[in-house]
């Protein structure tokens, strides 16, 4: 804007003067008069203020002091002390001369965009056309990098032309706007992400089964995490993602029904691995389904053995009971004596009958020989007793006593046969152990009636049987 205004003011100058005096800044400058005082060291060298071409670049080597430039600017504005100070007014027409002091002599004050308008940041544009940047971040256009008030010439101040200042201001404005835009964009992005995350966080989890969409805010953590309600987590078939699926407890996700075995709630793959970890591997490497059944427990075998022993004990107890009941057979003899009637007083006066019965031997003979042993001996004794009674010629009382004794012996023989049958199991197991005891089995039986008859007839009816 400023350059266009300066160009508009310079159009009123004649073409020859403009062609001779126009420099790179776009406005006409007075003739270069020699003057002293630009060097801060007071060297007094004569320098041309404005030169055409590359001579003007000597102004930016750091030898120009801003205080001297300001004094020169005021002198040029007032037209005092400098020859040719009113050169523009003399060369320009009256209209242009009237407009020139307002546009060139009055320094224009402006602030850089994007910076606070303070006294330190206000820079005069106009007569001298020099700008000094003391504070704030400044980009070094010549060097292409960033810098402050120190330029390429280290230790000296750097001054820029108005065009350079405008370029720097544009870069500053662009960078600041870009930074602000980036910061705003990042801020909005972060804010947007925060809002989105907050919205996502506050959105309640819902069941992923189609048609359910149950709110799982008050459900268990497991159901909230896997987004499935309690009902669909245990359902046999669930419509999810357009397919009939089932929720796997091992995988914690939905699988198609083909991956499950029947009504299992864990997929086949994970269930196989789970069972393999829990069960011990077999010796043959067979699976649990093909493995043979486990052997019967020792407890059952012991129980069966104990039961067999118990049964044998029962048989032994029964045998002993039968043997003990043999004692009651003597009572039967007493009953027969009562029937006879002749020996009631004798039986009352006689001492009670006694019977000593030792342990019976096991059955070692064959089945055909069941009538041998004690039965044969008893029969032989009864036969000899009958012959003896007949030879002596005793009365009917002796015959009745002999018959009762014969009945007693037969009952004892019958009980012996029953004992053999009942003690069969014990004889098979303990046959070898009882061989050495066979010689000690003695059956002795005595009767009070026999003792009475022996006292009368001087005969002993006491017999002993050894089983060999």
Swiss-Prot record:
The lineage of its organism: Eukaryota, Viridiplantae, Streptophyta, Embryophyta, Tracheophyta. GO terms for cellular component: nucleus. Trans-acting factor that binds specifically to the consensus nucleotide sequence 5'-TNCGTACAA-3'. The SBP-type zinc finger is required for the binding to DNA. Its main location: nucleus. InterPro entries: SBP-like, SBP_dom, SBP_sf. GO terms for molecular function: DNA binding; zinc ion binding. Pfam families: SBP. A zinc finger (SBP-type) spans 204-281. It is found in: Nucleus. It comes from Oryza sativa subsp. japonica. This is Squamosa promoter-binding-like protein 5. Residues 438-458 have a biased composition (Low complexity). Keywords: DNA-binding, Metal-binding, Nucleus, Transcription, Transcription regulation, Zinc, Zinc-finger. Ubiquitous. Zn(2+) 2 binds at residues 248, 251, 255, 267. Residues 363-372 have a biased composition (Acidic residues). A motif (Bipartite nuclear localization signal) lies at residues 264-280. Residues 270-305, 354-374, 405-458 are annotated as: Disordered. Zn(2+) 1 binds at residues 207, 212, 229, 232.
């Amino acid at each position: 804007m400023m350059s266009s205004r300066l160009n508009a003011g310079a159009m009123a100058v004649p073409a020859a003067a403009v062609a001779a005096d126009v420099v790179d800044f776009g406005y006409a400058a007075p003739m270069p008069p020699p003057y002293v005082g630009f060097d801060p060291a007071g060297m007094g060298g004569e320098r041309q203020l404005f030169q055409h071409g590359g001579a003007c670049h000597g102004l930016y080597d750091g030898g120009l002091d801003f205080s001297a430039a300001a004094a020169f600017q005021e002198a040029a504005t007032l037209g005092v002390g400098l020859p040719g100070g009113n050169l523009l007014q003399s060369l320009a027409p009256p209209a242009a001369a009237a407009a020139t002091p307002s546009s060139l002599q009055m320094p224009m004050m402006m602030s850089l965009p994007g910076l606070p308008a303070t006294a330190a940041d206000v820079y005069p544009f106009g007569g001298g056309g020099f700008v000094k940047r003391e504070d704030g971040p400044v980009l070094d256009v010549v060097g292409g990098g960033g810098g402050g008030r120190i330029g390429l010439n280290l230790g000296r101040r750097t001054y820029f032309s108005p065009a350079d200042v405008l370029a720097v201001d544009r870069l500053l404005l662009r960078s600041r706007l870009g930074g602000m835009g980036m910061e705003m964009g990042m801020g909005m992005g972060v804010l947007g992400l925060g809002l989105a995350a907050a919205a996502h966080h506050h959105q309640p989890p819902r069941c992923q089964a189609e048609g359910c969409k149950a709110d799982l805010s008050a459900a268990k953590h497991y159901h909230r995490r896997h987004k499935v309600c309690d009902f669909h987590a245990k359902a046999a078939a669930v419509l999810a993602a357009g397919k009939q699926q089932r929720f796997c407890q091992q995988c914690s996700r939905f699988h198609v029904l083909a991956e499950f075995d029947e009504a299992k709630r864990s997929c086949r793959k994970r269930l196989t691995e789970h069972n393999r970890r829990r069960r011990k591997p077999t010796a043959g490497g067979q699976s649990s389904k093909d493995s043979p059944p486990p052997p019967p427990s020792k407890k059952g075998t012991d129980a069966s053995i104990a039961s067999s022993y118990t049964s044998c004990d029962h048989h032994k107890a029964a045998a002993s009971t039968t043997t003990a009941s043999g004692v009651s057979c003597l009572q039967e003899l007493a009953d027969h004596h009562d029937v006879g009637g002749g020996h009631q007083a004798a039986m009352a006066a006689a001492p009670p009958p006694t019977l000593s019965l030792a342990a019976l031997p096991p059955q070692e003979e064959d089945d055909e020989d069941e009538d041998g042993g004690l039965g044969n001996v008893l029969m032989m004794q009864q036969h000899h007793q009958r012959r003896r009674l007949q030879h002596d010629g005793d009365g009917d009382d002796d015959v009745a006593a002999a018959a009762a004794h014969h009945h007693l012996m037969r009952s004892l023989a019958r009980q012996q046969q029953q004992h053999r049958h009942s003690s069969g199991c014990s004889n098979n197991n303990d046959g070898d152990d009882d061989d050495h005891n066979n010689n000690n089995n003695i059956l002795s039986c005595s009767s009070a009636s026999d003792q009475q008859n022996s006292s009368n007839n001087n005969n002993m009816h006491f017999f002993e049987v050894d089983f060999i």
